[in-house]
Amino acid sequence: MTDVIDDGGIASEVRAKIGQAVRAKLDRNPMVSRIDAPGLEIYGRHHFLDMQECAALRALIDADAQPSTLFSGSANADYRTSHSCNLSPWDPLVTQISDRICALTGLPPENGETLQGQRYATGQEYKAHCDYFPVTASYWPAMMKTGGQRSWTAMIYLSPVEAGGETHFPHCEFMVPPVEGMILIWNNMQPDGAPNPLSIHAARPVEKGTKYVVTKWFRERRWCA
């Protein structure tokens, strides 16, 4: 008999407390606005990065981006058609921005995964997916050992897009259009610490222009790559 603790798909006091702490910190920040999305905790802040910082990050992405894969490691020509790369944690700008995300949310730096850059050309998209780990996935036992569930997601738009490219939360029936320098922060868990299916989201196809984002995911425990 295989003894696997299936703690990632149920309520968790640890993840609930993480949610409470981040929620309280963001709610106190006058620069941060909570987005009205019943059943989902999602926040936004405009001008989190300036134009120069966005341009520098776009250049880093352009230098290293490769065709995106799914978390399982497979490529899917229809499901995720963007280009992406992990940004070097030793780059001073990447380090500074990761630190600022942690300061904004109150989440421990050691729980944060490497900042990932993504680029979407016209017609490219990432269909509906969750950031939390399905406990039925083949990779879940490995994720348990490297920090556990993903609790919060922070994503920053790095470019204006002439048309399309919205972040779509289909179960909440709302979309957030790309605004250069804006950060979105959402809780992948419900208030009790169980995964929240309402956090499922998609990167809508870019209709005109090029969309750049960086994303940072936070684990419930120290992340071990």
Where are the regions that the model predicts?
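Fe(II)/2-oxoglutarate oxygenase catalytic core
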Residues: M1-I185, M189-A225
